[in-house]
Amino acid sequence: MILSTINLRGIGGNPKFSTLRRLFVLIHLDLVMVQETMFDGHKVCQLFLKLFPGWEVCAIDASGRFGGLLCIWNPLTCDLAPFALPFGILLVGHLKGFDEEVKILNLYGPYRDRMSFWDGLASCGILHDGLFIMGGDLNLTVSTDEFWGNTHRDPLADYFSDLSVQLVWWTCARIPWLPLGIMGEVVT
């Protein structure tokens, strides 16, 4: 089972889209969470369904030149039901090889008013019950290992450290439009 989360900063460009397609084929991804599609949700779903017939997709519209979320998954390995939420896309169901129900959240965290955003997410209860995978652009540093020098420590990092979450570090792949060719997180 290979899951990935990728911040594209615009999905419409030909180099990005063709490289993303090669990524799907070469790595045999089972589920991908995309942030910052900068695209209409319905159009991006249709685009992916043409390339990957039989796969399932769910998308949230971009707001002007920012935002836009997409989840795409292989129904042979992921039996998931999508729910569009004010703060992201929630997928609920089962992954091949796991008996327990899993919740997968793809979100794009805000730059401003982050505390009320995370308080709202925490109060809805999905962070506490059962298996949970969160991917996305959090606009937040959640690992204390990432703080250095006189960097201001974000109180939300303490919230995550209190949840007993396991952070998954990046696995490298060559994608030309990203700095140093680093891809989003890949979980195997």
Residue ranges and their predicted role:
Residues 1-188:
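A shared catalytic/ligand-binding motif for oxyanion handling
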